[in-house]
């Protein structure tokens, strides 16, 4: 153990390993020929339901077949209320190649799906369930979802607890414009909150820290498997590495743990390097870790202001690169909303899940938040439009922000 500790405490080892993994990831994701296992002539597909969303006259389903497929099906007289995660279905339809962006600097839907390893869309003509779910993890997921399906605030419970952002496009776009969309991603704040609750109960059972860390890490891993997301992966890996570092007394620096987090995340999912949610989450966390000594000297109010300001500043280059605009009111919104969401809305979301009678209160908060966000997003005077910068400029701007 002493030898391992000595190796990991090496000044440059972790940095070199992370850089090597990063370079290999770039080469692998850009030059390895990823191809679909299907051909355009295929008309029938059998797979397991991993995601689905039912609207008035359309259902969108993601299935795990020979590869991931995204299915859309318009129906008139058939309902899909009996569909569950883990069900095996047979789909008949036509394979469609996802559309590319028509303008160079606009959203590329084909590339977005490619990074999720989805190469084809399916326009379904029929969908039939051929077997019910028998997977224990999917059963847990179904039970968790069934409890909230009829609640008015179910979309926010799914978003804040289950990494399933089912908010309307209009609302999501207003949050993006106002620079607060990251507040609705399951991240370190959520993990810390859940771990604190688990610790609160475990303190009544045992004082053994190893057992506490083991149980919380098992919870985090199951949580990640049930509700996979890019920002959650970063938070989960980092939390587990922190606990290993503490238990084994490896004395690895925080910044090196963060670099290890990137390396492990890329080994788990190489394409996460292109995920905007992960880029935001990791970049903001990276600069917060670098600023940890400064944060320790500040009181709670100043800490919230500092975190909000730093998060906004370091995310500016990323936002400009992807959206070509920033909203200067984002600073104020983050300062106001970070404590509201972390102290009021997130705990209330958990309580509403446990006690559905609180649904109307949570709905009042979230509906008010949506109304304010929609109003502010339409104020053009606070928006600044930029030409798309090069990637090098984005990196240099981020470094300069911290300096």
Regions found by a protein language model. Give the residues of each.
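Divalent metal-coordination and catalytic microenvironments
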Residues: 47, 93, 160, 187, ...
